Amino acid sequence: MAAPAVSGFSRQVRCFSTSVVRPFTKLVRPPVQIYGIEGRYATALYSAASKQNKLEQVEKELLRVAQLLKEPKMAASIMNPYIKRSIKVKSLNDMTTKEKFSPLTSNLMNLLAENGRLNNTPGVISAFSTIMSVHRGEVPCSVTTASPLDEATLSELKTVLQSFLSKNQILKLEVKTDPSIMGGMIIRIGEKYVDMSAKTKIQKLSRVMREVF
């Protein structure tokens, strides 16, 4: 039963890789469109995994692939452009068999190898993660402060930020510190950007003072 799905997935990725638009109507459309080669592979994978109800499984497997490719020995045998493609395919088959990856993930890696696109693997994984994040209703938000926030302030901040989201959206918060902003905070939520840092306020004040004097 798995062979037709894998074969279909192969055709989908090849069609996307050669910019053939017609098969797109057969795909399960992702919640967000990712452009470029990585986006095409990720979109085709999302469609195939969605049809088989294996989105979460494939996502976990891709994160594992990302970890494995950071290992020097694995990276040397797969990502090196001077190594023969047949050797890369064998290394990939050994890896996917050892890790017991699903046919979807295994086939993706083989396709990347066959098409000479293994260097695009990190980008494909990143694109798929982005699609899955939107699929879950996650809204990325980064908050930068000059010094770490205490628990009470952080909790209040989360409540305020969550209030700007709809009920089916999930806040995915990342808090960073950057002493150079001097105070206040910089917030980026979704496509919105708000700079309330002391550094920016001082710069604005400086410009106003120059105009006055």
From Swiss-Prot:
In response to mitochondrial stress, the precursor protein is ubiquitinated by the SIFI complex in the cytoplasm before mitochondrial import, leading to its degradation. Within the SIFI complex, UBR4 initiates ubiquitin chain that are further elongated or branched by KCMF1. Residues 1-23 form a transit peptide. The modification N6-succinyllysine is found at residues 90, 100, 158, 199. Keywords: Acetylation, ATP synthesis, Hydrogen ion transport, Ion transport, Membrane, Mitochondrion, Mitochondrion inner membrane, Transit peptide, Transport, Ubl conjugation. A motif (SIFI-degron) lies at residues 5-23. The modification N6-acetyllysine is found at residues 54, 60, 70, 73, 100, 158, 172, 176, 192. It comes from the Eukaryota. The keyword Transit peptide applies. Pfam families: OSCP. GO terms for cellular component: mitochondrial inner membrane; proton-transporting ATP synthase complex. GO terms for molecular function: proton-transporting ATP synthase activity, rotational mechanism. Belongs to the ATPase delta chain family. Subunit OSCP, of the mitochondrial membrane ATP synthase complex (F(1)F(0) ATP synthase or Complex V) that produces ATP from ADP in the presence of a proton gradient across the membrane which is generated by electron transport complexes of the respiratory chain. ATP synthase complex consist of a soluble F(1) head domain - the catalytic core - and a membrane F(1) domain - the membrane proton channel. These two domains are linked by a central stalk rotating inside the F(1) region and a stationary peripheral stalk. PANTHER family: ATP SYNTHASE DELTA CHAIN. Component of the ATP synthase complex composed at least of ATP5F1A/subunit alpha, ATP5F1B/subunit beta, ATP5MC1/subunit c (homooctomer), MT-ATP6/subunit a, MT-ATP8/subunit 8, ATP5ME/subunit e, ATP5MF/subunit f, ATP5MG/subunit g, ATP5MK/subunit k, ATP5MJ/subunit j, ATP5F1C/subunit gamma, ATP5F1D/subunit delta, ATP5F1E/subunit epsilon, ATP5PF/subunit F6, ATP5PB/subunit b, ATP5PD/subunit d, ATP5PO/subunit OSCP. This is ATP synthase peripheral stalk subunit OSCP, mitochondrial. It comes from Rhinolophus ferrumequinum. The gene is ATP5PO.
